[in-house]
Amino acid sequence: MTKSNTRAPFPWFGGKGNPKIKKAILGLLSEHEFYVEPFGGGASILISKPAAKVEVYNDVNRGVVNFFRVIADADYFGKFMARAALLPVSRELFEEFGRTWPGIHDPVEQAVRWYYIAQQSFGGMFAKSWGTAVTTSSRGMSDTTSTWRASFENLPKVHDRIQRVQIECADWRDILKRFSGTGWLAYCDPPYVAGTRKAGGYDHELKDKDHEALIAALLVYDGAVVLSGYNSALYAPLAKAGWDRQEIEVVCSAAGRTRTSGLQGVGKVKEKQQRIESIWRNHEAMRRMKN
């Protein structure tokens, strides 16, 4: 499957922006007419794949859903760009916006503040801590400022891509029921099972019973399924049902926080913070790849 050069618009905890895992997932997406992501997050995969006849993005996080709705709207997008481009990189603004964005009723202003936080949060962990650079620089300015300024170069591509996508804000159960049948492919990237990682990171967690319910729903889903996450005993029914599973070794950037400064580490982090991502496919997804 040919990928586009459009990137996800912001870092997202547990997202699939890592080039290695993204390439692996894109390579396993079978042919489809219709496409749905029940756990959309930063939309790394959706934005990077070729467009399908019908595409559905869903997330229960109202902040990220409002952001994508604003970016998809031609009038709102221009206003968003004009406002966001004026903002400097500032810890005070980061903290202020972290307190105030949920109470903003203007969708454009809420999206601007939400995006500011998402772009500058360390490790994609929304509003948990400010991800700043102390001594590193790029393009004649600090890495933090350079990254913020460079993020606007990608947004017009995101705008063009997301305009054709149906944006939902609903429970994953409802989404899987509504968007299924002949020609559908569901790519699911739920929050990692709690027992496979340290606590925190997600604003909307899934409990073990939710993961069990998800697996049960995917086993009877009418369509092709590709699922990503860390392997867990909760996912054992997939192997029993004959689903294919592939493993990809990646670096967990969110684990790179140094103990003393709270900043992202380098070097030893890459040596010691390895994670094994799993990608599962159901029989229908595998059948389509063979045809």
Model-derived segments and spans:
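Short alpha-helix immediately C-terminal to the canonical SAM-binding loop
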Residues: 65
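A short linear boundary/processing microfeature
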Residues: 52, 71-74
